[in-house]
Amino acid sequence: MALRYPMAVGLNKGHKVTKNVGKPRHSRRRGRLTKHTKFVRDMIREVCGFAPYERRAMELLKVSKDKRALKFIKKRVGTHIRAKRKREELSNVLAAMRKAAAKKD
């Protein structure tokens, strides 16, 4: 119990102490991206490019058909959450491409 005032009575009575914060459990890190995994995925993306369904989804996103793109990706990857993550990833790629094109001009 971290105390605000060293008082003898009340909710905050007792000695002033600092809370002992423990490390998070190892099981909590599932799904986190490590530096190595990110590097490998980026390398593969650079070499292989995008899958045909990803290219089509990016075309849909270019013409502001976000909902249609989500439905299309969901059909391909299986679940709604994975589809949302993939759509977000592809829209970030498009934004980066637009930014690079604007910087080049």
Swiss-Prot record:
**GO biological process entries:** cytoplasmic translation
Which parts of the sequence carry N6-acetyllysine? 62
Q: Which UniProt keywords apply?
A: Acetylation, Cytoplasm, Ribonucleoprotein, Ribosomal protein
Tell where it localizes. Cytoplasm, Cytosol; Cytoplasm
Q: Provide any one GO MF term from the record.
A: structural constituent of ribosome
Cellular component terms (Gene Ontology): cytosolic large ribosomal subunit
Which Pfam families does the UniProt record give?
Answer: Ribosomal_L36e (PF01158)
Q: What is its main location?
A: cytoplasm
Q: Which domain of life is it from?
A: Eukaryota
Cysteines paired by S-S bonds: none
> Subunit structure of this entry?
Component of the large ribosomal subunit.
In which family does this protein belong, per the annotation? Belongs to the eukaryotic ribosomal protein eL36 family.
Q: What this chain does, per the record?
A: Component of the large ribosomal subunit. The ribosome is a large ribonucleoprotein complex responsible for the synthesis of proteins in the cell.
Protein name in UniProt: Large ribosomal subunit protein eL36
What are the leading ranks of the lineage?
Eukaryota, Metazoa, Chordata, Craniata, Vertebrata
